[in-house]
A protein has these predicted regions:
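Thiamine diphosphate
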Residues: 3-8, 32-174
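A short, flexible N-terminal coil/short beta segment enriched in small residues
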Residues: 1-19
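Acidic-glycine-rich active-site phosphate/pyrophosphate-binding loop
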Residues: 16-35
């Protein structure tokens, strides 16, 4: 599955949500689909999207918060899984795109998921009540819709190909 295809599949459902992305490919591909004022791109903040999303979810419980994370990023901040599980915000959906490499820094470094580490199992072991791992666009869309309806903290790991955008440039006219 390509990340862009997965993002395109859920893009319409993101309209009413606060969306926090990690740096690089996720941010660029989401922006290319069409910037919205409720999209917050954490450029140059690898590892912090999950923490930022958690803070927003806790402080604004009336909003649905979607974090679009990456395997390298969450591996830099595994403690956020236990903190999310501790507070269990029902309005937080944590999507982790797992391509098994550090794509945004050159793709020359593999992550621990390339050798068997299972991020969905880590989230479940940390206490996240709803976890899933998917590898097709249809399964991703279905799992995302189920997360929206569940009103429960969810970590959704999407296995994707290590392919990035043609350009990482984002202009949000700030």
């Amino acid at each position: 599955m390509l990340r862009r295809d997965a993002l395109e599949a859920i893009y319409p459902e993101l309209a009413p949500c606060v969306v926090v992305t990690i740096m690089g490919a996720v941010a660029a591909e989401l922006h290319d689909l069409g910037h919205r004022p409720n999209f917050f791109y954490l450029e140059h903040a690898m590892g912090l999207a999950s923490s930022m999303g958690l803070g927003i979810a806790l402080s604004r419980p009336e909003l649905t918060v979607v974090v679009l994370d990456g395997d390298g990023s969450i591996l830099m901040n595994l403690g956020s899984l236990t903190t999310m599980a501790r507070y269990q915000p029902p309005n937080l959906i944590h999507v982790v795109f797992d391509n098994e490499v550090l794509l945004s820094v050159g793709q020359s470094f593999t992550t621990a998921t390339a050798t068997g580490s299972d991020l969905a199992a880590m989230a479940a072991a940390a206490g996240v009540p709803r976890t899933a791992k998917v590898d097709t666009v249809d399964d991703f869309r279905d799992a995302f819709h189920a997360a929206l309806k569940s009103k429960a903290l969810t970590t959704l790991v999407a296995k994707i190909e290590p392919e990035g955008p043609a350009s990482y440039f984002i202009d949000v006219h700030m």
